[in-house]
């Protein structure tokens, strides 16, 4: 964010000019920073090592924690921090940069949360895999578990994390979520219909929270709603997402997809022939303070190479996750 006194009246005047000029620039910079919020979301692909032991979860927890791309944000939303050990390691690695953190959604309903709402169950095999870390104090933390999922998602406490964050003299409300996955194991249940209901649960929560309309409300995470080929279709699930959340469409920059098997080594190994998808977003509520500008930029950071061994064969990758991070810049009025 990131003088010396001179002899004589003229020199003294010049010195004052320099001094006050520097203070003005400093004040302007401080004002700009106070009116800008930087929020990132990243699905970090930390599946449980009990089921998926060979995806370098602990290695990547260290690589992500040391990576430049995740630094210098105000708030970071993490998705798929399912593996207990790797997620604890990642959160620990991020603690210096982001000392204010939530627990992982759905892992427990203890006093690390101000409230636990929705359909939390301690008997559900997997947690919800969402956590939020912040540079600024988090003054309220609520976890909410969705009423319904389909396919394997039924075996996790998926939902959303709500945080009320105080940046200097203003409050910002950030919801991090990971919606229902597209899954053939859902049978006759449409994953899109489940996602719509989950979005309605988020919107109902916000409505009932009675947040002052001059405060900013942001939604972020892996929505599992594909923007590609849907932007100009008013009947698309993409359009419906914004309508349901009463959210404004951001400006998009950077890479054209957040999951891309043509450019990402992990995605390529898993699904080499699948088309690219844009699934991860940071968007703002239109029912509350409206940002003068919000941009979603897809980054493509490459990680140092990391290697795993499976059945005596070595596999080497150079990505932090199968998803790319999305960095949002929000200009607040």
Swiss-Prot record:
<comment type="function">
    <text>Required, with sphingomyelinase, to effect target cell lysis (hemolysis).</text>
</comment>
<keyword id="KW-1015">Disulfide bond</keyword>
<dbReference type="Pfam" id="PF03372">
    <property type="entry name" value="Exo_endo_phos"/>
</dbReference>
<dbReference type="GO" id="GO:0004767">
    <property type="term" value="F:sphingomyelin phosphodiesterase activity"/>
</dbReference>
<keyword id="KW-0964">Secreted</keyword>
<dbReference type="GO" id="GO:0005576">
    <property type="term" value="C:extracellular region"/>
</dbReference>
<comment type="similarity">
    <text>Belongs to the neutral sphingomyelinase family.</text>
</comment>
<dbReference type="GO" id="GO:0031640">
    <property type="term" value="P:killing of cells of another organism"/>
</dbReference>
<protein>
    <recommendedName>
        <fullName>Sphingomyelinase C</fullName>
        <ecNumber>3.1.4.12</ecNumber>
    </recommendedName>
</protein>
<keyword id="KW-0354">Hemolysis</keyword>
<dbReference type="InterPro" id="IPR005135">
    <property type="entry name" value="Endo/exonuclease/phosphatase"/>
</dbReference>
<keyword id="KW-0378">Hydrolase</keyword>
<dbReference type="InterPro" id="IPR017766">
    <property type="entry name" value="Sphingomyelinase/PLipase_C"/>
</dbReference>
<keyword id="KW-0204">Cytolysis</keyword>
<dbReference type="InterPro" id="IPR038772">
    <property type="entry name" value="Sph/SMPD2-like"/>
</dbReference>
<feature type="disulfide bond">
    <location>
        <begin position="150"/>
        <end position="186"/>
    </location>
</feature>
<feature type="signal peptide">
    <location>
        <begin position="1"/>
        <end position="27"/>
    </location>
</feature>
<dbReference type="InterPro" id="IPR036691">
    <property type="entry name" value="Endo/exonu/phosph_ase_sf"/>
</dbReference>
<keyword id="KW-0732">Signal</keyword>
């Amino acid at each position: 964010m990131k003088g010396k006194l001179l002899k004589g009246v003229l020199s003294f005047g010049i010195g004052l000019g320099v001094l006050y000029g520097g203070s003005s620039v400093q004040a302007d910079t401080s004002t700009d920073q106070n009116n800008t919020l930087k929020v990132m979301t990243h699905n970090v692909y930390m599946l449980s090592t009990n089921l998926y032991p060979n995806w370098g979860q602990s290695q990547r927890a260290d690589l992500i924690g040391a990576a430049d791309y995740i630094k210098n944000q105000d708030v970071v939303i993490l998705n798929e921090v399912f593996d207990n050990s790797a997620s604890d390691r990642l959160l620990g690695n991020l603690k210096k940069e982001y000392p204010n953190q939530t627990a992982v959604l759905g892992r427990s309903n203890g006093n690390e949360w101000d409230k636990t709402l929705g359909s939390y169950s301690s008997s559900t095999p997997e947690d919800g895999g969402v956590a939020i870390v912040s540079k600024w104090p988090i003054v309220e933390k609520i976890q909410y578990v969705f009423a319904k999922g389909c396919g394997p998602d039924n075996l996790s406490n998926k939902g959303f994390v709500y945080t009320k964050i105080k940046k200097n003299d203003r409050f910002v409300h950030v919801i991090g979520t990971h919606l229902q996955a597209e899954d053939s194991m859902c049978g006759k249940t449409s994953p899109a219909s489940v996602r719509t209901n989950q979005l309605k649960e988020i919107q109902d929560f916000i409505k009932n929270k009675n947040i002052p309309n001059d405060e900013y409300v942001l939604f972020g995470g892996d929505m599992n709603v594909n923007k590609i080929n849907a932007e100009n279709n008013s009947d698309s699930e993409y359009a419906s997402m914004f309508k349901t959340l009463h959210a404004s469409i951001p400006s998009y920059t950077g890479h054209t997809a957040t999951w891309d098997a043509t450019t990402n080594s992990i995605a390529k190994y898993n699904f080499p022939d699948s088309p690219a998808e844009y699934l991860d977003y940071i968007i703002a509520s239109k029912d509350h303070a409206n940002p003068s500008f919000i941009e979603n930029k897809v980054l493509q950071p490459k990680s140092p190479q990391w290697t795993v061994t499976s059945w005596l064969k070595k596999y080497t990758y150079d990505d932090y996750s199968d998803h790319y991070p999305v960095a949002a810049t929000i200009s607040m009025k």
